[in-house]
């Protein structure tokens, strides 16, 4: 017999497996927050939902249901059913969900059954699954040891993390590199989507039973994405690994990240001329964002050097002069700030080393030597 209701006990399995999901909520609800494996194929669009909601408040549930049927009928109803069937043809194992796992899920399931498709819906809907994911974030720090990877700007922390199976890449989830120049071309996720994706990454990490959870030593805000407070507090108590890198390698890594990759990305998106203009604005606006912290004199020196580098790149197709302002940025801003912050938490430093030494240290790590007791 085909199951028509997926119980809340299967939330973990849904997210770990990346189960295809049909989100029946209106677009306005979906855009506030959803799940990575979901697609929005609403039962009612925004205006229809608004009318039904007003009717529910004024006349009650039965009147609202009747209005919903009158709004979504005939050709409109068939269009919605066809959209669901089209998705199910490509993803036959998909589940349905609405906000609470109530009327919208049940009605959609009924219409699909009449069309010849038996599709389960998720108990508790979006609200139940969202609350479950919040709980995952809150409880994870107590379930396994946390280690925080620190290192000067340009030391290659993200490059290192993505090579480690015990790591979760917070900046990748936030789509932001964490620094003043960390903005990417594509926008960051909504706060809710950031939290949902973080929780799912943590679930998958737990599934693999690693000896620890390795995270980058982040600020509370990664761009505009805020780490959940309890999770951030746990990170602030974690032992620290300091990734060390030679200055020339740091400079060239930042040249590649800030200049080569960003310029290429803007050009691919917008074309040569508009892409270069957008790239220039990205650099100049990033610098402007730290103007107060730099002070007027240092800001002007950096801006002038950056403008010269952009002019050389535009006229001679050379990027080497960008190293001048990147070097100034490290000397005048990033490095002093990092050294000050690390000094305050020096008592939490567990290990220092370059990429190779850090890999070897983590490879030799065992659950016994990294228990909650000797980390705390």
Curated annotation (Swiss-Prot):
The active site is at residue 98. It holds the Pfam family Rhodanese. Coiled coil: none annotated. Residues 15-138 form the Rhodanese domain. Keywords: Selenium, Transferase. It catalyses: 5-methylaminomethyl-2-thiouridine(34) in tRNA + selenophosphate + (2E)-geranyl diphosphate + H2O + H(+) = 5-methylaminomethyl-2-selenouridine(34) in tRNA + (2E)-thiogeraniol + phosphate + diphosphate; 5-methylaminomethyl-2-thiouridine(34) in tRNA + (2E)-geranyl diphosphate = 5-methylaminomethyl-S-(2E)-geranyl-thiouridine(34) in tRNA + diphosphate; 5-methylaminomethyl-S-(2E)-geranyl-thiouridine(34) in tRNA + selenophosphate + H(+) = 5-methylaminomethyl-2-(Se-phospho)selenouridine(34) in tRNA + (2E)-thiogeraniol; 5-methylaminomethyl-2-(Se-phospho)selenouridine(34) in tRNA + H2O = 5-methylaminomethyl-2-selenouridine(34) in tRNA + phosphate. Its EC number is 2.9.1.3. GO terms for biological process: tRNA wobble uridine modification. It is an enzyme of class 2 (transferase). HAMAP family: tRNA_sel_U_synth (MF_01622). Monomer. Belongs to the SelU family. This is tRNA 2-selenouridine synthase. The gene is selU.
């Amino acid at each position: 017999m085909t199951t028509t209701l997926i119980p809340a006990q299967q939330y973990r399995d849904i997210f770990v497996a990346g189960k295809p999901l049909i989100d029946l909520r209106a677009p306005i609800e979906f855009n506030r927050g959803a799940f990575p494996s979901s697609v929005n194929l609403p039962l009612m669009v925004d205006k229809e939902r608004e009318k039904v909601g007003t009717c529910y408040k004024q006349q009650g549930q039965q009147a609202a249901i009747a209005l919903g049927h009158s709004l979504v009928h005939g050709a409109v109803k068939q269009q919605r059913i066809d959209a669901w069937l089209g998705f199910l043809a490509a993803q036959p194992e998909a589940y349905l969900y609405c906000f609470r796992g109530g009327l919208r899920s049940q009605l959609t399931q009924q219409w699909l059954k009449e069309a010849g498709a038996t599709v389960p819906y998720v108990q508790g809907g979006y609200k139940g699954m969202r609350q479950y994911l919040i709980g995952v974030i809150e409880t994870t720090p107590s379930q396994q040891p946390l280690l925080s990877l620190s290192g000067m700007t340009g030391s290659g922390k993200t490059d290192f993390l993505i090579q480690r199976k015990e790591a979760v890449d917070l900046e990748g989830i936030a789509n932001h590199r964490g620094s003043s120049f960390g903005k990417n071309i594509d926008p960051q996720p909504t706060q809710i989507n950031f939290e949902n994706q973080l929780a799912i990454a943590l679930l998958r990490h737990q599934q693999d039973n690693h000896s620890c959870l390795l995270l980058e030593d982040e600020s509370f805000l990664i761009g505009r994405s805020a780490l959940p407070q309890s999770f951030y507090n746990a990170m602030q108590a974690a032992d620290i690994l300091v990734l060390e890198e030679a200055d020339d390698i740091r400079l060239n890594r930042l040249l590649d990240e800030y200049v080569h990759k960003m310029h290429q990305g803007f050009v691919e998106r917008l074309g040569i001329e508009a892409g270069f203009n957008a790239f220039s604005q990205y650099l100049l606006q990033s610098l402007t964002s730290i103007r107060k912290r730099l002070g007027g004199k240092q800001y002007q020196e950096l801006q002038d050097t950056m403008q010269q580098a952009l002019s050389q790149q535009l006229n001679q197709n050379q990027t080497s002069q960008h190293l001048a302002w990147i070097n100034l940025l490290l000397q005048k801003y990033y490095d002093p700030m990092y050294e000050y912050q690390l000094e305050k938490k020096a008592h939490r430093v567990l290990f220092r080393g370059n990429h190779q030494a850090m890999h070897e240290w983590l490879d030799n790590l065992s659950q016994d030597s990294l228990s909650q007791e000797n980390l705390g």
